[in-house]
């Protein structure tokens, strides 16, 4: 990484004024900073983009990413409700590699040792850097300074705020869903990978330009009670196990 300009913040720590090409506001103290601007707005959706049947299914993750317009430099998000049993994130970046895409920013709500294969994608240029909690091998890789960009760790609420306040723009959100229907309604209450609520992915579903739901339990419409609304979803695909 290039040398960073550092300033002393209100907590007495030297911190950069720019992170991954964006201005960073040093901590000023409690109630000392008044944010300006407006919240981000999600794109307008239209029925023109979807089949009359409401069936948004595509054959696989690679097809979904291609349909979503994945290209170099985009931000791709995932959630961590499946924790150290998540098969989806690795599949996403394997597919991105097959598509020849480079310099992606991965924006997980958290990552775990199971995601260690993504180190290979940082080495081969598919992933530029990660902004999200990094546990295990990924955390070590970042801490030792191997990542081309700077790692950014946010609280769960801080991640949601960063998305809604436009600090982070998600180009493509990939949401692992234990149960979903072909329209994109989804929840985590049932299915082989049932995990409970999908709240960590809520902001992603609401603000991302494109939203892909990946499930191993595709059921008939309607999937109720849904937490991820199909109206916010562009593509649905399946894996043998998520």
Each PLM stretch: what is its role?
Residues 2-242:
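Conserved alpha/beta enzyme-core scaffold
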């Amino acid at each position: 990484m290039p040398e960073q300009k550092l300033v002393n913040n209100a907590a007495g720590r030297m911190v950069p004024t720019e992170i991954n090409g964006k201005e960073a506001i040093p901590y000023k103290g409690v109630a000392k900073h008044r944010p300006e601007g407006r919240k981000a707005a999600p794109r307008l959706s239209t029925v023109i983009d979807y089949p009359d049947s409401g069936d948004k299914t595509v054959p696989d993750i690679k097809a979904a990413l291609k349909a979503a317009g994945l290209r170099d430099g985009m931000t791709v998000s995932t959630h961590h409700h499946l924790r150290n049993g998540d098969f989806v994130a690795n599949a996403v970046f394997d597919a991105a590699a097959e598509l020849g895409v480079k310099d992606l920013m991965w924006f997980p709500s958290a990552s775990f040792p199971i995601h260690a294969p993504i180190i290979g994608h940082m080495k081969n240029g598919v992933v530029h850097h990660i902004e999200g909690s990094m546990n295990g091998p990924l955390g070590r890789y970042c801490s030792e300074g191997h990542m081309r960009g700077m790692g950014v760790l946010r609280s769960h609420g801080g991640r949601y705020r960063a998305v809604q306040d436009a600090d982070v723009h998600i180009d493509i959100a990939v949401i692992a869903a234990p149960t979903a229907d072909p329209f994109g309604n989804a929840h985590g209450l049932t299915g082989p990978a049932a995990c409970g609520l999908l709240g960590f992915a809520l902001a992603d579903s609401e603000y991302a330009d494109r939203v892909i739901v990946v499930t191993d339990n595709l059921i008939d419409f309607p999937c109720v009670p849904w937490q991820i609304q199909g109206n916010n979803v562009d593509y649905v695909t399946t894996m043998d196990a998520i």
